[in-house]
Amino acid sequence: QVEHAAKITNDNKIVSEFSFMIGLPQESIEDMLKTVDFIKKLKKIGEYVMTQNVQLYRPYPGGELYNESVRLGFDAPRNIREWTTGKLLEIGGFVKPEYLPWLRNDNKKAMVIRYVTTLLFWDSGRKWESKVTFWWNWVRRAAYAILNGTFAIRRKLDFWALPVECQAVDIIR
């Protein structure tokens, strides 16, 4: 249904934007890679199909996933003050993979998450964008092509050690 909606809106030159989440408890690496593949498939539909930067799952109270996160060792803030100070405030309210126990020591999942949440959106840049941003988007697309190639090689070889491209992204930012 999502693909169909994307095709219809693109054919009618209506911008559609889709959002995704990754890093849920019990999510397999295969599921994460399927998400990557689906996002790429959507983006190929046309220039009016866009995706937001993929978000890493953030455990919030009040649901089964939150309870499962706590059971898996998530060190949840215990009161409102803790939700607004400390480690969550340091990272702008967004949880880093190292704060989620089911991701903390899994280099493969951490690399996939880093790729999906940081690099996958870099290839945006549509012909209808302003000319002011064209040059910067050209540079971003070139960097994206290199980093995307690196990710493809990692995926093919199933090699997830030495995450140098993550450090490169931090420098580029």
Functional labels for PLM-detected ranges:
Residues E64-N67, P77-R173:
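Radical SAM enzyme core and accessory elements
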Residues I39-L42, L72-G73, D106-N107:
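Alpha-helix boundary/capping residues
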Residues I22-E30, G46-Y99:
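Flexible glycine/acidic-rich beta-alpha junction loops that bind and position SAM and/or redox cofactors
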Residues Q1-G63, L119, D123, K127:
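Conserved C-terminal portion of the radical SAM core fold
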